[in-house]
C-alpha cells in the first residue's frame, strides 16, 4: 500500500530556518519550493539549502517544486534533485501530459505531481 499525503506544507527553499521548522511539522509532506517563493537572485542559495538537507530519517515526505520546464533555472533544479533524498517533484505551469512525460524521462522513477 502506498501512502498518499493528506496535508502538504509548502516552504521557501531559501530559508534554512523555515525548512527546519517545516520538517518538524505534522504535515504529511513538505514541498521545498524553488519556484515562485524564491527570488531569482536567491535560486542558487535555495539549491544549496536542499543539498545540505542530507538523508531523511522519518517525518514527512520531502517533495520539491521546481521551476517550470524551459525556464532558465529548470536544469539546475533537476541536477539538485538527482542527488537529493526526495519522494517526488511538483511541476508547476505544466501545459499537459507531454510535460509530465518529458520530466519523467529526465528523472527516472521519481513521482511527479503536475500543477496545470
What are these regions, as identified by a protein language model?
Residues 2-116:
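Conserved alpha/beta-domain cores
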Amino acid at each position: 500500500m502506498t501512502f498518499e499525503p493528506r496535508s502538504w506544507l509548502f516552504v521557501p527553499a531559501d530559508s534554512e530556518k523555515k525548512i527546519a521548522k517545516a520538517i518538524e511539522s505534522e504535515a504529511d509532506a513538505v514541498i521545498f519550493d524553488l519556484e515562485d517563493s524564491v527570488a531569482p537572485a536567491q535560486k542558487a542559495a535555495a539549491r544549496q539549502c536542499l543539498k545540505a538537507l542530507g538523508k531523511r530519517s522519518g517525518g514527512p515526505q520531502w517533495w520539491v517544486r521546481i521551476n517550470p520546464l524551459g525556464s532558465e533555472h529548470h536544469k539546475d533544479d533537476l541536477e539538485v534533485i538527482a542527488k537529493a533524498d526526495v519522494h517526488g517533484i511538483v511541476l508547476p505551469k505544466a501545459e499537459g501530459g507531454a510535460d509530465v512525460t518529458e520530466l519523467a524521462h529526465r528523472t527516472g522513477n521519481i513521482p511527479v505531481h503536475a500543477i496545470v
